[in-house]
């Protein structure tokens, strides 16, 4: 049987995600971000709610990406997620993209010329942002051109890099309906961005979201809920360079900007430069919020939920892979668990995220 991997955030889960799961074959394993997202923001609803939405709509097994995989630039996000799915035995990776290219060919190219390609990136001037360097590399070696608004295409290239040299086939699916950041309401498939913006519009949610009741009942948060906490972290920390990935230049800019910024958005605007993109600045602010430090990724894989089919697969994996289904005295990943505790501070009604939580079981799919 085919075992298909899907890397996702489901922030929140919508019809486009359901379409992706419907297109996937065989046993469907989702590696999903926890409570903080790749572009450096808190999830609108918590990881358990999002895992349940996925399981109700076609996923067989949902596992959690640790914090230091979730909140990373595309390449590291892709690498970390593919590592986890590879250990879970996937033979194909399905993903949505704005431009369906021959990603398999691109992966083969990277297998062959990876070292040379990385050297090319290292030699590019530091005035370029990391995404600009990556795009220059793909243009040079694969003749690829980019427009700035194809984040899924950028992630797809990161997945192509991550599967290079592994026995995993890539299956791109043409993204349906609205673009990634589109807030358009007159489409067949709305984007997650639009759903976050129109979260109080009942009709809109019902049109574009399969598990709408789950979403409506869940406690929701936005970045601004954490602004006082973020401000406190910045003001009270004498040396921000002790935080993961924060360099001297960024530390100075952030300390200066917090004197006048009245919101997270304003802070991001003030700190962003040509070299430091908004997404990168948001990630740095997320690291500061949760006081992230460089740390090893966890050995075990945290299971958020499964169907009967997923349970059978877990049984098969037992003994081959370290699986964590309950977090008790022994931590799974200290960094992720700390991030979860801080996530809970954004809304007092968010349920406990780790202790006493067991995987969600869905009997039928």
UniProtKB/Swiss-Prot annotation:
Broad class of the protein's primary localization: cytoplasm
Family: Belongs to the TmcAL family.
Protein's UniProt keywords contain tRNA-binding: yes
Residues annotated for ATP binding in this entry: 7-20, 96, 152, 175
Gene3D superfamilies per UniProt: HUPs
Reaction equation(s) it catalyzes: cytidine(34) in elongator tRNA(Met) + acetate + ATP = N(4)-acetylcytidine(34) in elongator tRNA(Met) + AMP + diphosphate
Subcellular localization: Cytoplasm
Record field: transmembrane: none
Coiled-coil region list: none
GO cellular component, one term: cytoplasm
Name this protein carries in UniProt: tRNA(Met) cytidine acetate ligase
Disulfide bridges in this chain: none
Annotated Pfam families: HIGH_NTase1
EC number: 6.3.4.-
Family matches, as SUPFAM superfamilies: Nucleotidylyl transferase (SSF52374)
Function according to Swiss-Prot or TrEMBL: Catalyzes the formation of N(4)-acetylcytidine (ac(4)C) at the wobble position of elongator tRNA(Met), using acetate and ATP as substrates. First activates an acetate ion to form acetyladenylate (Ac-AMP) and then transfers the acetyl group to tRNA to form ac(4)C34.
GO BP terms in the entry: tRNA modification
Tagged with keyword Zinc: no
Entry's Gene Ontology molecular function annotations: ATP binding; ligase activity, forming carbon-nitrogen bonds; tRNA binding
Keyword annotations of the record: ATP-binding, Cytoplasm, Ligase, Nucleotide-binding, RNA-binding, tRNA processing, tRNA-binding
Origin: domain of life: Bacteria
